[in-house]
Design a protein with these regions (language model features):
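Positively charged, small/polar-rich N-terminal and surface patches that mediate targeting and assembly
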Residues: 1-130
Length: 130
């Protein structure tokens, strides 16, 4: 019976936590990089500095864009970064300081909803802005 009560309390606690998620508390940022090595270095720094909970590095992206009046096409990787919305400014600053491009892509979108335990985990890993 104590085990059942303990499990029930944990379930209720998780349900309460998930019901309290405020849409937009977390964001997903997207950053392209010229190689997997560059992306891994940036990703490791973001996680180490508690600016991101997780960074997925997706290979084999082709970017087509205009630069200095020319159409360019480059093979890149893209990072999908999960963080707190309140930390986006610091995250962008870190990427700009550690990225080889003159103008690096850092764009983001707020997370409206998701798997409650995962969203809770992001909150645990990435502290609120000080």
């Amino acid at each position: 019976m104590p085990l059942l009560l303990s499990s029930g309390r944990r379930l209720l606690s998780r349900m309460a936590a998930s019901a309290s998620y405020v849409a937009g508390t977390h964001s997903m940022a997207f950053v392209t990089a010229p190689s997997q090595e560059v992306a891994k270095k940036i990703a490791s720094g973001l996680v180490k500095n508690k600016l991101a909970a997780c960074v997925n590095i997706i290979p084999n992206v082709v970017s087509v864009y205009e630069w200095k009046e020319e159409i360019c096409e480059d093979a890149e990787v893209i990072m999908m970064i999960k963080t707190r919305t309140s930390r986006l400014e610091e995250l962008t600053k870190y990427v700009r300081e550690n990225h080889p491009y003159d103008v690096c892509e850092v764009i983001s979108s707020k997370i409206d909803q998701g798997n409650p335990p995962y969203l809770d985990w992001i909150s645990e890993i990435v502290p609120e802005k000080k």
